[in-house]
Amino acid sequence: CIYPKLAPQPLKEDYLLTGELEPTNEPYAIAKIAGIKLCDAYRSQYGCNFISVMPTNLYGIHDNFHDQNSHVIPALIQRIHSAKISDQKQVEIWGTGQAKREFLYVDDMASACIHVMNAPFAQYQQMTVTQPHLNIGTGEEVTIQELAQLICEVVEYHGELIFNDQKPDGTPRKVLDISRLHRLGWQHQISLKKGLAQTYSWYLNHQGRLRTV
């Protein structure tokens, strides 16, 4: 969300502050950008080896599974699981299902952060000459329809998915360029289907103790 609304895809680090932000996310984006710039200023002024990274959409264990306020993956897991146990024949999903998104499992996020912190700081500086942060993601995109179908496979739900095209899709495509991170020697390890399976298993084992705020 820190990148301009109309920035080219995939989103390169260099696109930061090159255009107007998405209005609905602007305060959130400005807060993140301020954090990146503050770390950069401390690094310049005081010589602190601060590192800034910008992740793509994260998911995994300990996520927020609130039925109204959660992000797309926990929301779909909760909704499709509920449909399965209540024997609902259909699940409605907002939008056409054709919007494309990128998702990173939380353990891969932690792995990437550790990798970047352990890399020689001179390498990080070489990668961040034009902008003081690195993107973290998979570089792989999936449509919301494909995501929902994967979750149905993991949950073993055999009903029908109904896409309500009267509801908004949001940004048609959102994927990060992670070529700099790859040049630094890091690759994600957890496939989307494996990550979804681990997340659903955790969800099942923590009924009654889920974060729902």
Residue ranges and their predicted role:
Residues C1-Y59, D63-Q68:
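Catalytic helix-loop patch of NAD(P)-dependent Rossmann-fold dehydrogenases
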Residues P10-D14, N69-H71, A110, C152-V154:
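Glycine-rich, phosphate-binding/catalytic loops in enzymes
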Residues T24-P27, P55, P74, P168, ...:
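Proline-centered helix-kink/hinge sites
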Residues T24-Y28, T56-S70, G95-D108, T138-E140:
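Glycine-rich "substrate-gating" loop/helix at the edge of Rossmann-like oxidoreductase active sites
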Residues I33-D40, S44, P74-Q78, S111, ...:
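Conserved active-site helix of classical SDR/Rossmann-fold NAD(P)-dependent CH-OH oxidoreductases
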Residues P55, I73, I77, A110-C113, ...:
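Alpha-helical structural signal
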Residues S82-V213:
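C-terminal substrate-binding subdomain of Rossmann-fold SDR/epimerase-dehydratase oxidoreductases
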